[in-house]
Amino acid sequence: MLAKRIIPCLDVTAGRVVKGVNFLGLRDAGDPVEIARRYNEQGADELTFLDITASSDQRDIILHVIEAVADQVFIPLTVGGGVRSIADIRRLLNAGADKVSINTAAVTHPEFVQQASEHFGNQCIVVALDAKAVTPENDRWEIFTHGGRNRTGLDAVEWARKMQQLGAGEILLTSMDRDGTKAGFNLPLTRAVSDAVNIPVIASGGVGNLQHLVDGVKEGHADAVLAASIFHFGEYTVDQAKQAMRAAGIEVRL
């Protein structure tokens, strides 16, 4: 059994790490290079770096920040935000990213995922799904784009399957209902997507304590768990998270 991964997430806008609730109300969490270095030292398995306003205001990705982060970090680095072309992916990989996350462009041009996968190999293509419940029972979820502002009408589980078929090597699944709330992952959503595909699924959105990370793996069937605010603001360290997962019988790299 593969070890489950713990992945701190750096949401970056205007060169600063920020954290909001339900994609709004952003709070400054610090300098991305300093934060990335700290997580590297704490033993994070990977880092995810999302330029959260790149798609919505059509800004080019801040390559100099990525280069500075990649220079300090010796664990796999996934970078996303405003990725719209093969040239964008090449620039990010050249700047030091190990994997590139495609979100809005996967919806507007699904064939782009296939082109990217054929060009660079599916091991470095992550498709990010921002999903939100569209029923009161929390049993159906749809994909939203542009930082959660645009509803697409696409069913999240079906979309994950399609992305796998087109060559995604990994799914980064964010529950927008839970993002920043600290109420825990949306476990029915996480489980439905994880069980529908046979590529790794990273659960994101809602972590408020270490038990939530455990639940994401045990109940959500996720291959990796991503968190931001519990790490950024010093509530827990990555090592504490790994110890909690290990105590719950989950294999992790210590």
UniProtKB/Swiss-Prot annotation:
Compartments, as annotated in UniProt: Cytoplasm
One Pfam family of this chain: His_biosynth
Pathway(s) it belongs to: Amino-acid biosynthesis; L-histidine biosynthesis; L-histidine from 5-phospho-alpha-D-ribose 1-diphosphate: step 5/9
Keyword RNA-binding appears in the UniProt entry: no
EC number of this enzyme: 4.3.2.10
Enzyme class, broadest EC rank: lyase
GO biological process terms on file: L-histidine biosynthetic process
Keywords: Amino-acid biosynthesis, Cytoplasm, Histidine biosynthesis, Lyase
GO CC aspect terms: cytoplasm
UniProt xrefs under SUPFAM superfamilies: Ribulose-phoshate binding barrel (SSF51366)
GO molecular function: imidazoleglycerol-phosphate synthase activity; lyase activity
Gene3D superfamilies linked: Aldolase class I (3.20.20.70)
Active site: D11, D130
Reactions mediated catalytically: 5-[(5-phospho-1-deoxy-D-ribulos-1-ylimino)methylamino]-1-(5-phospho-beta-D-ribosyl)imidazole-4-carboxamide + L-glutamine = D-erythro-1-(imidazol-4-yl)glycerol 3-phosphate + 5-amino-1-(5-phospho-beta-D-ribosyl)imidazole-4-carboxamide + L-glutamate + H(+)
Complex and partners: Heterodimer of HisH and HisF.
Family named by the database record: Belongs to the HisA/HisF family.
Function: IGPS catalyzes the conversion of PRFAR and glutamine to IGP, AICAR and glutamate. The HisF subunit catalyzes the cyclization activity that produces IGP and AICAR from PRFAR using the ammonia provided by the HisH subunit.
NCBIfam families the UniProt entry points to: hisF
HAMAP family: HisF
Protein name (record): Imidazole glycerol phosphate synthase subunit HisF
